[in-house]
UniProtKB/Swiss-Prot annotation:
One of its GO terms (cellular component) is extracellular region. This is Trypsin inhibitor. The record marks R15, H16 as: Reactive bond for trypsin. Coiled coil: none annotated. Inhibits trypsin. It comes from Veronica hederifolia. Keywords: Disulfide bond, Protease inhibitor, Secreted, Serine protease inhibitor. It is found in: Secreted.
């Protein structure tokens, strides 16, 4: 079980093609660990 910070690091590592995709990834991190 990854913590939110670890999840966010993964999002940034993916280098999404658009800021919107990155934001969606980060939002999912928050939701998963609510």
């Amino acid at each position: 079980n990854t913590d939110p910070e670890q999840c966010k690091v993964m999002c940034y590592a993916q280098r999404h093609s658009s800021p919107e995709l990155l934001r969606r990834c980060l939002d999912n991190c928050e939701k998963e660990h609510d």
